[in-house]
Amino acid sequence: VDLILVNGNSVSFSYQLRQGDRISVYPVFESMDITNICHLRPAPLRETKFILDVHLGKLCKFLRLAGFDTWYDKSYDDSEIVRIAEEQKRIVLTRDKGLLKNKKLSRGYWVRATNPKIRFGEILKRFDLWENIQLAKRCPTCNGLLTPIAQEEIEDKLLPFIRKTYKEFFQCSGCDKIYWKGPHFQMIKKFMEEFK
């Protein structure tokens, strides 16, 4: 329970009920920001982390490009997905309704769209993630965090054209891949802006 409304007003557990009070009780909200009301939990707004099933590989890449912690491995079966989701407090995104019926699973969402771009917009809307997009935060390949790195430290890994043209670089903490803000970055930025 994260929210109790009595007669339309937010109250805490200590509220004493009166005759005729109308009560509504709500779980943790995923798709709207309820920052300015009386929360019953110490940290109601969450760090949104996902784990995706085998059907959502392209959605995984879009979510990582937007900076969201997104776990995906097409070799995982349903039981492994549920185990990881529960251990790491991840939301399962799936096209498999059967997976969502698992009694051990506490947080999941059935992705309705079939087009990867539309799926991405669906997830942004469903979990109210517009304001949380952070480009150049996660590696689209392995989900590792990207950290700024000085060009001098990676000179030997860059092609001459890249060395001359770009000055801002990032390295993945997971797979050591190097990224820079080239034309692909502008395309990603434009793509993300389409969903606002």
Where are these regions (language model features)?
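Short acidic beta-strand-loop surface patches of small beta-rich interaction domains
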Residues: 2-17
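Short linker/helix segments within small regulatory modules
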Residues: 14, 157-168
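Loop/turn positions that initiate beta-strands
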Residues: 18-25
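Short, Lys/Arg- and Gly-enriched loop/turn segments at beta-strand edges
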Residues: 29-41
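BRCT (BRCA1 C-terminal) domain core and associated BRCT-interaction motifs
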Residues: 76-90, 97-100
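Residues immediately within or flanking Cys/His clusters that coordinate Zn2+
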Residues: 136, 169
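Short cysteine-rich clusters marking metal-coordination/redox-active sites
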Residues: 139-142, 172-175
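Short functional micro-motifs and their immediate structural scaffolds
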Residues: 144-148, 180
